[in-house]
């Protein structure tokens, strides 16, 4: 297993390549590993990994990874996000692709845990299991719209954490009510952030609202304190085109929270975690589940 992890860090993924790596670095490896019988063959490596209990392996690996964090560092924002591993689809046996739900430490750039589901719709049941693995007290949990469920919000608050949940059309009339609210009341806080570079200018405007009595009466969300509207506008100086996108969120944080930073941290999962899984660990090419 140690040899496998070293190989993955060296961007090798085939079992015969792992065997060759072990043979090439045999003198170095035997100083730290017990290798009385030498480097195992690629067939042996394959069989060993078929027998591993990956839940236990994950737990041990995460405990080890936790020790790598600098002393005194803590999680502030934990982004929960799902990803379909396209390479896991087995059309011959009619097995769909595996969907993984990850917990990502935004500050530390570390995957804190994951749960496997058969499709994206099962994220709703996987997210509470994933939260149970973690100590989330005092953190901010960010989740996309699939995880915007009253039971999940309640669990986060009960575990003494806060939430920022993406709001789309999957929660009855809550999104429509939020849009109507904007026409009736003024935001209690506003902020703006501008990024320039590569011939583009991106402006992010955040408006924070306190829920109206109508929303309180018709939507039961434990801990709900704010509703957030985030509008991102991108101006391309070369093509002279402007694209604007508006997203809504509900949160247990108060109006003074740095919503732009927290939400951008969640978006960073695509670049930070998913890119590593695809390019370094080759998840979209893996077939073993």
Give the residues covered by each predicted segment.
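Short, small-residue-biased leader/transition segments that mark boundaries at the very start
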Residues: 2-9
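DNA-recognition alpha helix
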Residues: 14-33
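Short coil/turn segments at secondary-structure boundaries
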Residues: 19, 60-63, 75-77, 190-193, ...
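Active-site- or DNA-interface-adjacent structural scaffold in DNA-acting proteins
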Residues: 35-93
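Polybasic low-complexity intrinsically disordered regions
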Residues: 68-161, 168
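An anionic, glycine-rich sequence signature occurring as long contiguous blocks
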Residues: 165-264
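Structural motif
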Residues: 239-240, 287-289
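Short amphipathic alpha-helical "interface-anchor" segments enriched in bulky aromatics
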Residues: 254-287
